[in-house]
């Protein structure tokens, strides 16, 4: 006759089976509280707010220059870049409107700062786009794409100066949503609208 040895694993399984069969099952045993959630998806509302923030930042640099000169404008631009762009994490794909080779692209914060306020001998062609007397900034989107924690927009930005003249630029942005919920620019391409020769 073959004998089955009562190994610890068999004993444990038997006890567990007995407990499960004898214990009354209730719905309460399986109830859990509201689950904690983490959502890293960027929303359209967040993108639109980030665009408004960019316009507000540009106007604040212009206002700082008008009221306090270059030093105040540079300090303000530093803050705007830290809040709006992701330079603290690495290079940003930034192609400003009015830059020329060999400094067309501005992947570093220093290059972006020079474009916005000028005054950097390493970027001698920059005169300070953001210190011009801008009074209004309006974003007009043609495309908004949402891809998880990233979003890309394409459209126009209309800038109005103190005399009421409007400058329109073609604008493409890519935004990233940080774990803390903040939205920053990782790609910024800007150019003047193309006019075909007649």
Description of each model-found segment:
Residues 28-87:
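Short, low-complexity N-terminal intrinsically disordered segments enriched in polar/charged residues
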Residues 30, 146-154, 158, 162-197:
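Short beta-strand edge/turn micro-motifs at domain boundaries
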Residues 5, 18-20, 135, 144:
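Sterically constrained small-residue positions within well-ordered secondary structures
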Residues 8-9, 139, 170:
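Short beta-strand-initiation
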Residues 12-23:
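Bacterial N-terminal signal peptides
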Residues 1-8:
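N-terminal secretory signal peptides that target proteins for export/translocation
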């Amino acid at each position: 006759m073959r004998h089955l040895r009562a190994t610890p694993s068999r004993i444990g399984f038997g006890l567990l089976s007995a407990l499960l069969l004898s214990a009354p099952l209730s719905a309460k045993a399986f109830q859990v509280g509201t689950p904690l959630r983490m959502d890293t998806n960027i929303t359209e509302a967040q993108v639109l707010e980030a665009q408004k923030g960019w316009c507000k930042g540009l106007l604040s640099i212009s206002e700082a220059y008008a009221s306090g000169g270059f030093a105040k404008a540079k300090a303000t631009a530093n803050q705007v870049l830290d809040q709006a762009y992701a330079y603290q994490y690495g290079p940003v794909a930034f192609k400003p409107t009015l830059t020329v080779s060999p400094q067309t692209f501005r992947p570093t914060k220093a290059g972006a700062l020079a474009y916005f306020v000028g005054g950097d001998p390493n970027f001698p062609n920059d005169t300070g786009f953001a210190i011009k007397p801008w009074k209004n900034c309006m974003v007009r989107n043609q495309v908004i794409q949402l891809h998880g924690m990233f979003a890309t927009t394409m459209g126009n930005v209309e800038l109005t100066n103190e005399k009421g003249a409007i400058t329109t630029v073609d604008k493409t942005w890519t935004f990233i949503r940080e774990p803390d919920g903040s939205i920053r620019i990782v790609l910024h391409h800007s150019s003047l609208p193309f006019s075909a020769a007649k």
